[in-house]
Amino acid sequence: GDFAAGAAVVNEFCQEREYTSTHLGREFLAKEPTDDNYVSASDCCRLLSDIYNGTLVNEKADSDMLELLKGQTVKTKIPVGVPDGVKTANKTGELSDAKLGVVENDIAIVLDATHPYVIAVLSNGVKSNSEAQNTIAKISKDVYEFMASQK
């Protein structure tokens, strides 16, 4: 496919919906990038909220996206921090590259029956994947406990 055309569509979509801290500027691991990719935790949380509330595209498309997120097989970060039986719909991102370093990210809709919420934990330049995953799980646990106390 044509990366530039696809990136333009993604960036326009983000701008139209005021995800102003998100930009797709280069192919993943491009050898000589002329631009960069970035996203904020705030934009990620808004995106997940819009999907959960059915207000991102339309009810059917948003429901389909939610089902895809529920099917995530990497459950080593945010899902570790919530009690057994609490479902999550999450999207992870990870990178371990000699030049770019270690990145571990996870964003999720925590589908708790009494207090569903969204959470995004993004990292950059951490020492190891396992250390970052453990930290994300700890943050997730702390957030879950806080949200549960707000009933």
Please report, for each region that a protein language model flagged, where it lies by residue:
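Mid-domain, small-residue-enriched loop/turn segments at the edges of structured enzyme/sensor domains
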Residues: 1-56
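Structured C-terminal helix/loop/strand segments within mature extracytoplasmic catalytic/sensor domains
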Residues: 2-4, 47-76, 81-86, 91, ...
